[in-house]
Amino acid sequence: MSEARKLFIKTYGCQMNVYDSERMAEALGAKGYVLTEVAEEADMVLLNTCHIREKAAEKVYSDLGRLRPLKTAKPDLKIGVAGCVAQAEGEEILKRMPLVDLVVGPQSYHRLPDMLERTEGGARVVDTDFPEEDKFDHLPERKATRGPAAFLTVQEGCDKFCAFCVVPYTRGAEVSRPFARLMAEARGLVERGVREITLLGQNVNAWSNDGRGLGGLIRELARIDGLERLRYTTSHPNDMADDLIEAHGAEPKLMPYLHLPVQSGSDRILKAMNRKHTAEHYLRLIERIRAARPDILLTSDFIVGFPGETEADFEATLDLIRAVGFGSAFSFKYSARPGTPAAEKPELPAEVCDARLQRLQALVTEQQRAAQMAMVGREVGVLYEKAGRLPGQMVGKSDHLHAVHVEDKAGQVGDLVRVRITASAPNSLAGERLGA
């Protein structure tokens, strides 16, 4: 029996890419590949890339450059680039990096085994088409899970065309996976020990199928015996339907956590971004969501230094942050992406963007620390995902997605326990198990 070939995957960017990497590993597993965490051991190295920011894209080329010595030492090593950089740059990757054997876009990775077979004869292959067929129809059934929490992609693509964003160009139009297939995949995950599922999509709350929206899907998933927790990400304010907001109050298995990007608090900048909503619309949404689920923790995304942003625009963003009170937020300086409308506009001075980002992050950090301190003394559910670094310690995620360290010598990965929070650190909480 021949020795199994080894596959190393490096994943960049969003949770969608984490899910895609798992599915690519499963597709190649059907061809005899097993995962390794050591690139030097691999027979194939696959970089699953992100194109949302310029630095993310350039990091891929830097990492490819670091693979040159390995390719020289192992000429039969196959190197592939997948994901959104692959979709955006295609043939250009082969021109810039002769060591790359194949380039596969996010809508084509079900064809990865066939592409790899073609490289065995020396061909260099690019497949960045948007096929008519559903790629999920051609992928093997999910058989492996890496813990009690799993991702499930329910929707791909985006039709919003925000002026700064490449997603509509790299991931295509919004497509919702069929309800029946999602239910079957979720049941399969639970049968393999998964207790928490996070529903994924570039614009996940745009999902619709068979007359259901995302709220209806969540209600049906919650009926699966053994599935204890549900989450979803990432959402657009314009697709927060009444049914979905109601689900936050009505469905106990839907965790009290919501990531709802707003990007700016200035209506003028929101219009320039083509966000199709106002700051007031966002604030009213937050009121309704909190009315449905008062204990919900909210997080968001912000871009500072968007072309044309004035000091007054930036102050409006700070005002919105103060008005909402976020548990955390991802914040970035504007990064022009080729092919997007905003890339044609003059950029702000770097020093202005740097100063604004520091001010925004200081405010968000203050809110994050306050939110975590407010958890001290409260009882929360924690799903253990791994053993801690200290003996007898377990680490898991709370209902609000905080990392929690618990002293629990009898604890096992997959246990869902009640914990009293005893202390707050900058990026995590500590607690004691109740009823042990």
Curated annotation (Swiss-Prot):
Binding site for [4Fe-4S] cluster 1: C14, C50, C84
Intracellular or extracellular location(s): Cytoplasm
Domain TRAM: 373-435
EC number(s) on file: 2.8.4.3
Catalytic activities: N(6)-dimethylallyladenosine(37) in tRNA + (sulfur carrier)-SH + AH2 + 2 S-adenosyl-L-methionine = 2-methylsulfanyl-N(6)-dimethylallyladenosine(37) in tRNA + (sulfur carrier)-H + 5'-deoxyadenosine + L-methionine + A + S-adenosyl-L-homocysteine + 2 H(+)
Pfam families: Radical_SAM, TRAM, UPF0004
UniProt keywords, alphabetically: 4Fe-4S, Cytoplasm, Iron, Iron-sulfur, Metal-binding, S-adenosyl-L-methionine, Transferase, tRNA processing
Chain ranges of the MTTase N-terminal domain: 5-121
SUPFAM superfamilies noted in UniProt: Radical SAM enzymes
GO molecular function: 4 iron, 4 sulfur cluster binding; metal ion binding; N6-isopentenyladenosine methylthiotransferase activity
Family, as annotated: Belongs to the methylthiotransferase family. MiaB subfamily.
Protein name, per record: tRNA-2-methylthio-N(6)-dimethylallyladenosine synthase
Gene: miaB
